[in-house]
Amino acid sequence: MAASLQAAATLMQPTKVGVRNNLQLRSAQSVSKAFGVEQGSGRLTCSLQTEIKELAQKCTDAAKIAGFALATSALVVSGANAEGVPKRLTYDEIQSKTYMEVKGTGTANQCPTIEGGVGSFAFKPGKYTAKKFCLEPTSFTVKAEGVSKNSAPDFQKTKLMTRLTYTLDEIEGPFEVSPDGTVKFEEKDGIDYAAVTVQLPGGERVPFLFTIKQLVASGKPESFSGEFLVPSYRGSSFLDPKGRGGSTGYDNAVALPAGGRGDEEELQKENVKNTASLTGKITLSVTQSKPETGEVIGVFESIQPSDTDLGAKVPKDVKIQGIWYAQLE
């Protein structure tokens, strides 16, 4: 921004007009007045002819417009960079926007927020239906060895390699509030999985399927948790570069005869594709609720396995932290 404002100031500086060599520019009084600058001392006079004065005035006005335009654009750009993520909106505010107002802003990848309400879970005991359940990750870490030699495995910060399409939304399921204050949620339907790829500090990329399929979570509103299903990142019909698949393709790598070297133990995990599902665990916590509208928001932490490349690799633990939103009816 400083560089842009300096460039704007450079454009607004008066320049000498080389029409006649015998003319000397003694004052910038007219230019100063154009910019609203009052001269405190050293009043000078300028003996330019009328046509030269008009030309200088036009140049001054043009430089003024260009300078202010450049300065304004610099402020806009710097403000956008400082803002980072878009402002979090309520559910009604999101619904009131058109497609073009949402497109390219990042709002579609955000869960709604709540205005007002209370800082606890304030719903009466009973059976509800959770709708518009949304989970928005804000952090992805992967358990792996550090960059330094002989470092113990720990959750490492990662860099997101996919687009902003990792939020789960429109999830539905029964939500029960018991008289003792405990809650129970069962995931039944919705956009409950998203393919995500992150990169470790060493450059290794870790794909995984962010999901809460068949989640059954129970406990106090401050911390209710449960296990869920993590399907295989690839389906059984996926073929690897050598044409091998779970339900189709070659049984062994091309040019390796069946019953021979292709069935050796070290190659078995590559030849025999495994599409079995794994399990993950998530813990959710309510931070704010609004009973009059049925809205509730909170934070979550999920630990699930990464992709196994159809059984050829050992999965890594992926920790996902973020916020969630739901409407109870």
Curated annotation (Swiss-Prot):
PANTHER family xref list: OXYGEN-EVOLVING ENHANCER PROTEIN 1-2, CHLOROPLASTIC
Keywords, ordered alphabetically: Chloroplast, Manganese, Membrane, Photosynthesis, Photosystem II, Plastid, Thylakoid, Transit peptide
Gene of this entry: PSBO
Subcellular location: Plastid, Chloroplast thylakoid membrane
One GO location term (cellular component): chloroplast thylakoid membrane
Transit peptide interval: 1-82
Name the UniProt record assigns to this protein: Oxygen-evolving enhancer protein 1, chloroplastic
Species annotation: Solanum lycopersicum
Similarity section: Belongs to the PsbO family.
Function according to Swiss-Prot or TrEMBL: Stabilizes the manganese cluster which is the primary site of water splitting.
GO BP, one annotated term: photosystem II assembly
Keyword Manganese: yes
Keyword DNA repair: no
Highest rank taxon of the organism: Eukaryota
